[in-house]
Amino acid sequence: WGDSSSSASACWSCFSLVSGIGADQECPPGWSSHEGHCYKVFSEYKTWVDAEQYCTEQENGGHLVSFHNREEVDFVVKLGYTILKADIVWIGLRDFWRECHWEWSNGAQLDYKGWSDEPNCFIVYTVGNKWLHRKCSSTQQFVCKSPA
């Protein structure tokens, strides 16, 4: 049977491979982990307002996804494309007061910008990492983000 320490490390290797990229014990089943947050891609089509509401109603709370660096954008874009095979998802950015005062739906200030200056709610293309505005009343698939 061999040495128990080698069995333990073989077992750990199996767990690491099965858990996959973005899997974490701190996130609920079906959610992916990245830098202390949990993310889930939803295939339902909802307006921006309905998608944001849906995110806040999840068991771990949350909001439509917000981005604070390029690595986070890349993680979410890859996650969205892998799960949906779709190219557009809502993100939590919109001009709440229609005065170009941009903030995320969770109240965080915009500290990373990846679009040209145009108003409305925003989507991200999961191919090409481009952010574009859409009418908030249109329906898209979406990504929720919550603290781990």
Curated annotation (Swiss-Prot):
Q: Provide GO CC annotations from the record.
A: extracellular region
Principal localisation: secreted
Domain of life the protein comes from: Eukaryota
List the Pfam families: Lectin_C (PF00059)
InterPro entries attached to this UniProt entry:
C-type_lectin-like (IPR001304), C-type_lectin-like/link_sf (IPR016186), C-type_lectin/snaclec_domain (IPR050111), CTDL_fold (IPR016187)
Q: Does the keyword Chloroplast feature in the UniProt annotation?
A: no
Q: Give the range the annotation lists for the signal sequence.
A: 1-23
- Keywords for the protein's UniProt record, in alphabetical order: Disulfide bond, Hemostasis impairing toxin, Secreted, Signal, Toxin
Q: In which tissues is it expressed?
A: Expressed by the venom gland.
The protein's location, in the record's own words, is: Secreted
SMART domains reported in the protein's UniProt record: CLECT
Entry keyword annotation includes Disulfide bond: yes
- What is the disulfide pattern of this chain? C27-C38, C55-C144, C121-C136
GO MF terms, alphabetically ordered:
toxin activity
Domain (C-type lectin) spans 34-145
**Misc. comment:** Shows greater sequence similarity to the beta than alpha subunits compared to other heterodimer snaclecs.
The task this protein performs is described as: Interferes with one step of hemostasis (modulation of platelet aggregation, or coagulation cascade, for example).
What quaternary structure, including any partners, is listed in this protein's UniProt entry?
Heterodimer; disulfide-linked.
Give the protein family: Belongs to the snaclec family.
Q: Could you identify this protein by its name?
A: Snaclec 27
